[in-house]
Each structure stands twice: as C-alpha cells, then as structure tokens.
Amino acid sequence: MKDFIMPRTFPCPRCGQPSVWEGNESRPFCSERCKLIDLGAWASEEYKLKTQDAPTSGKGQHSDDYED
C-alpha cells in the first residue's frame, strides 16, 4: 500500500488562505489575483516601514541642498 503524502501548504501572505507550494506559479501567493493585488499595494505605497525621522537643522532634506 502506498503512503499518500500531503502536499505542503502555507498561508497566502495576501488573503491568508492555504496554498499549495509545489506547482504553484503564483507562489508565495495562492493565486495570480492575490499576486497582482499585492503588487498594486506596493505600487501605491501601502506598505511602509516605520522610521524615526532625524531632527532637521532647518536646511532642506535633499543632498542637493547642502553646500560642498
């Protein structure tokens, strides 16, 4: 009797639904739809890292604004 091996699954990072890893062209997402939704979120800057802004000295913040 052959043992049936369950395919490895993981939660989709976008919707959380279980998704099979092997043979999934959209991995780590469960579908092309979740993949494109996530791409759109990156493009519209929905994902941001929290940072602590450094105090400004009153000058502009761009490197072009500083004198050599």
UniProtKB/Swiss-Prot annotation:
A Pfam family per the record: YacG
Region annotation (Disordered) ranges: 48-68
Keyword Amino-acid biosynthesis carried by entry: no
Gene3D superfamilies on file: Erythroid Transcription Factor GATA-1, subunit A
Alphabetical keyword list: Metal-binding, Zinc
Note describing how the cofactor binds: Binds 1 zinc ion.
GO molecular function: DNA topoisomerase type II (double strand cut, ATP-hydrolyzing) inhibitor activity; zinc ion binding
Residues where Zn(2+) binds: C12, C15, C30, C34
Cofactor(s) the protein requires to work: Zn(2+)
GO BP: any one term: regulation of DNA-templated transcription
Summary of subunit composition and partner proteins: Interacts with GyrB.
Function: Inhibits all the catalytic activities of DNA gyrase by preventing its interaction with DNA. Acts by binding directly to the C-terminal domain of GyrB, which probably disrupts DNA binding by the gyrase.
Family: Belongs to the DNA gyrase inhibitor YacG family.
PANTHER family: DNA GYRASE INHIBITOR YACG
Record protein name field: DNA gyrase inhibitor YacG
Organism: Acinetobacter baylyi (strain ATCC 33305 / BD413 / ADP1)
